[in-house]
Amino acid sequence: MPLIGDDAPSFTAVTTQGIIKFPDDYKGKWVILFSHPADFTPVCTTEFMTFASMQEEFRSMNTELIGLSIDSVFSHIAWLKRIEEKIEYKGMKNLEIKFPVIEDLKMDVAKKYGMVQPKASTTQAVRAVFIIDPEAKIRTILYYPQSTGRNMQEIKRIVVALQKNAAEKVATPANWQPGEDVIIPPPSSMEAVKERMGKEEEGKRCLDWFMCLKKDTQK
């Protein structure tokens, strides 16, 4: 089972958008790879509709979505068509799901990513989310039980925070939202501590020598 910081396992898979090769087809992009237990299930349907409503928003963030379950591509297609043509939820309807959904009947990809967890199910993937950076490194792993749908806004928030860390080398505090203050890395020497505490900078505030924040300039 891969962990945060590991290389994301490579794979070639049949999907609703044709064959994909990961990571080759996604070089230079952030990827949200997520699994769901089964097609034609209510919680998964709400998740796919919500992801579909946000797919262009994610794409504008240089982030691509890839879905997966242990179902056939024909089941995926039938389910996605039903979602597009028949289902309305929270004002969302007629949603075209443009991102690929992997057929993983032999559980090849699911097992590589630890998406099959026997105490939950031996025949279905759990609700897993892997956020993968442009260098194909795993940056976040999330697991949800079958009964609980994912919070897509939280997934988006994590992507924004990871991208900010990659670009600016800052951290984000608890409950952070884009536009709020970010955390400057703490100094790593006594000299750096003296320099930081003795120097005032516009937009920066220190609660203590190890805890300084600055305004988020890219909102």
Swiss-Prot record:
It comes from the Archaea. One of its GO terms (cellular component) is cytosol. SUPFAM superfamilies: Thioredoxin-like. It catalyses: a hydroperoxide + [thioredoxin]-dithiol = an alcohol + [thioredoxin]-disulfide + H2O. Disulfide bonds join 206-212. GO terms for biological process: cell redox homeostasis; cellular response to stress; hydrogen peroxide catabolic process; response to oxidative stress. The active site is at residue 44. It is found in: Cytoplasm. Gene3D superfamilies: Antioxidant, Horf6, Chain A, domain2 (3.30.1020.10), Glutaredoxin (3.40.30.10). Keywords: Antioxidant, Cytoplasm, Disulfide bond, Oxidoreductase, Peroxidase, Redox-active center. The keyword Flavoprotein does not apply. Residues 2-164 form the Thioredoxin domain. Its EC number is 1.11.1.24. Pfam families: 1-cysPrx_C, AhpC-TSA. InterPro entries: AhpC/TSA (IPR000866), Peroxiredoxin (IPR050217), Peroxiredoxin_AhpC-typ (IPR024706), Peroxiredoxin_C (IPR019479), Peroxiredoxin_TDXH (IPR022915), PRX_1cys (IPR045020), Thioredoxin-like_sf (IPR036249), Thioredoxin_domain (IPR013766). One of its GO terms (molecular function) is thioredoxin peroxidase activity. Substrate binds at residue 127. PANTHER family: ALKYL HYDROPEROXIDE REDUCTASE C (PTHR10681:SF121), THIOREDOXIN PEROXIDASE (PTHR10681). Belongs to the peroxiredoxin family. Prx6 subfamily. The active site is a conserved redox-active cysteine residue, the peroxidatic cysteine (C(P)), which makes the nucleophilic attack on the peroxide substrate. The peroxide oxidizes the C(P)-SH to cysteine sulfenic acid (C(P)-SOH), which then reacts with another cysteine residue, the resolving cysteine (C(R)), to form a disulfide bridge. The disulfide is subsequently reduced by an appropriate electron donor to complete the catalytic cycle. Thiol-specific peroxidase that catalyzes the reduction of hydrogen peroxide and organic hydroperoxides to water and alcohols, respectively. Plays a role in cell protection against oxidative stress by detoxifying peroxides. HAMAP family: Peroxiredoxin. Homodecamer. Pentamer of dimers that assemble into a ring structure. This is Peroxiredoxin. The lineage of its organism: Archaea, Methanobacteriati, Methanobacteriota, Stenosarchaea group, Methanomicrobia.
